[in-house]
Regions:
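Extracellular serine-dependent O-acyl
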Residues: 190-193, 208-234
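N-terminal secretory targeting modules
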Residues: 1-31
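Acidic-and-aromatic substrate-binding clefts and catalytic sites of carbohydrate-active enzymes
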Residues: 64-68, 168-170, 198-204
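Loop/turn elements at helix/coil->beta-strand transitions in domains of secreted/extracellular proteins
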Residues: 29-30, 55-56, 82-85, 184-191, ...
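Histidine-centered active-site loop/cap adjacent to the catalytic His
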Residues: 238-250
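Membrane-embedded segments
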Residues: 34-35, 39-118
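Secreted/periplasmic serine-hydrolase-like ester/acetyl group-modifying domain
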Residues: 99-189
Length: 250
């Protein structure tokens, strides 16, 4: 099977090479696009959709991806794909806390779509440059397969109900709205999601994403709540609660 070729690394890659393999897919062949940071490419395994439901998907994600990067990557992806549904992870809305952070991310995002090595300077050796610019087909459809299991040791009420709301920077919110409008203009249905994350998620962030989804007239699906009973944090995480392993993703 395709899974047999996976190595099951324990650490997040500096650069998720398989994301760029979306450009090796036949044009207009992807039904559902998932886009976000390392939580997305660790949690969403598109092959399961194909096996169980018969529709195609691809997961695009880079480590610590910011919302301006999401916007720039969407524009690039839409030159080749017209997905019916776009799942946008909301975790990257919380990374840039100030206007300066946002402006810095916007500049880097525009440059990175033209020169990927600007953002990933540690790849500056012949082998890694080949990974960035070479034509590589991803049998995992962007998913980053990891088999290791490290249980969560923390005991906390991470999803304890509250009406308090996490503050999202206005520039981040504005860029997110641009993502939504762009997806709609291309004929796609954008959906805001949050994937399972024990250590980094809480009800204040849930409330913030629900609020921004309502303002943009889209649905929000919080998998931290939807899959609360299905995820076993003693077995389903690769690193003790930040990212899912293959068992959790399935």
């Amino acid at each position: 099977s395709s899974l047999s070729i996976a190595m099951g690394y324990n650490a997040n890659p500096l650069y998720n090479y398989s994301s760029y393999s979306i450009f090796q897919e036949p044009d207009n062949s992807i039904d559902v696009l998932s886009i976000g940071d390392s939580n997305v490419y660790s949690s969403i395994f598109p092959l399961v959709w194909w096996e169980q439901q018969g529709f195609t998907g691809y997961t695009w994600g880079q480590p610590s991806q910011r919302i301006p990067e999401t916007y720039e990557y969407l524009k690039k992806i839409y030159k080749h794909q017209k997905p019916s549904i776009v799942l946008i992870d909301g975790n990257n809305l919380f990374r840039d806390k100030t206007d300066i952070d946002n402006l810095d991310s916007i500049t880097k995002a525009k440059l990175a779509t033209i020169f990927p090595v600007i953002s990933f300077h540690k790849n500056l050796n012949p082998h890694r440059l080949k990974n960035i610019f070479g034509n590589r087909y991803s049998v995992m459809k962007g998913y980053y397969y990891r088999k290791a299991s490290h249980k969560v040791h923390k005991k906390k009420h991470r999803m304890k109900f509250t009406r308090k709301c996490w503050q999202i920077n206005k520039l981040s919110a504005s860029t997110f709205s641009k993502c939504i409008h762009y997806c709609k203009s291309q004929g796609s249905i954008p959906v805001l999601i949050s994937v399972p994350n024990y250590n980094g998620w809480n009800y204040q962030k849930h409330n913030a994403l629900q609020e921004i989804a309502d303002k943009n007239g889209i649905n929000f699906v919080d998998l931290n709540l939807e899959l609360k009973k299905q995820i076993n944090w003693k077995k389903d995480s690769v690193d003790g609660g930040d990212h899912l392993n293959i068992k959790g993703a399935k």
